[in-house]
């Protein structure tokens, strides 16, 4: 009853958890169901366990995911094993910390589209149009401070190991573009166009651009792709996304840079 009272009147509720254990796997679907029943847009952000955590934990996570999908409007999945695929020498304790940081950035990337004013601001209705009853979703993140930072940041986000799926049939995408005050509207529009070219022409794309002076000369792109199929096909990113020929940065280098920024 106390939890129900806390959720009453909320417009949007994030339920974050690590699936596979007892606490998150058992409680997250219940909380999500209560939040949705209270009328809130309910978005779950869940990590799937590392293979090193064992088969039983993996099976528990899959069962919990099915319950979570039926309870929440949208479930954003963060597959922990993808971190180790591209950085197999990453210590497991650091991998858990990176996974938690990604989960936090996923929530922050969505909420800042509403809460922070910027070049292009969104409201709750915009978020709901993408996240409401959209099923499965995944997230990609990228950033760059190069001379072609806009295209490089979106390329990195789309080729992120966390977004290792075919997004061509996704029903929607939420794009958060952040940069310092020298970021231009033209750069933001280039990022959105690259994402649009990867999706179905009928997909609903909502984007916002925020000013964050702590990023200095860097542009950070966060993409949440919703309404995806559950196939495991890789999302192919080609060099045609760049106006000029660019040397592709390996996923391992991208992850190393990301980890360096966290620790």
Which residue ranges define each predicted feature?
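Tubulin/FtsZ superfamily GTPase core signature
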Residues: 1-263
């Amino acid at each position: 009853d106390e939890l129900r009272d806390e959720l009453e009147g909320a417009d949007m509720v994030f339920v974050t958890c690590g699936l596979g254990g007892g606490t998150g796997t058992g409680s997250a679907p219940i909380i999500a169901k209560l939040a949705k029943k209270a009328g809130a847009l309910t978005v779950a952000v869940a990590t799937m366990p590392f293979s090193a955590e064992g088969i039983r934990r993996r099976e528990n996570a899959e069962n919990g995911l099915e319950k979570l999908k039926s309870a929440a409007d949208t479930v954003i999945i963060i597959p922990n094993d993808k971190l180790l695929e591209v950085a197999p020498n990453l210590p497991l304790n650091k991998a858990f910390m990176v996974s938690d940081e990604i989960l936090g950035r996923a929530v922050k990337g969505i909420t800042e589209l509403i809460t922070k004013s910027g070049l292009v601001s969104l409201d709750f209705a915009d978020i709901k149009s993408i996240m409401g009853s959209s099923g499965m979703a995944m997230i990609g993140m990228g950033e760059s401070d190069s001379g072609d930072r806009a295209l490089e940041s979106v390329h990195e986000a789309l080729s992120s190991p966390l977004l290792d799926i075919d997004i061509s049939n996704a029903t929607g995408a939420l794009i958060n573009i952040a940069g310092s005050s020298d970021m231009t509207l033209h750069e933001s529009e280039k990022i959105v166009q690259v994402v649009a070219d990867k999706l179905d022409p009928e997909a609903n794309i909502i984007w916002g651009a925020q000013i964050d002076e702590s990023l200095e000369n860097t542009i950070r792109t966060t993409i949440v792709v919703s309404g995806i199929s559950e196939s495991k096909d890789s999302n192919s990113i080609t060099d045609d996304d760049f106006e000029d020929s660019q040397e592709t940065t390996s996923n391992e280098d991208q992850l190393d840079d990301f980890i360096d920024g966290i620790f």
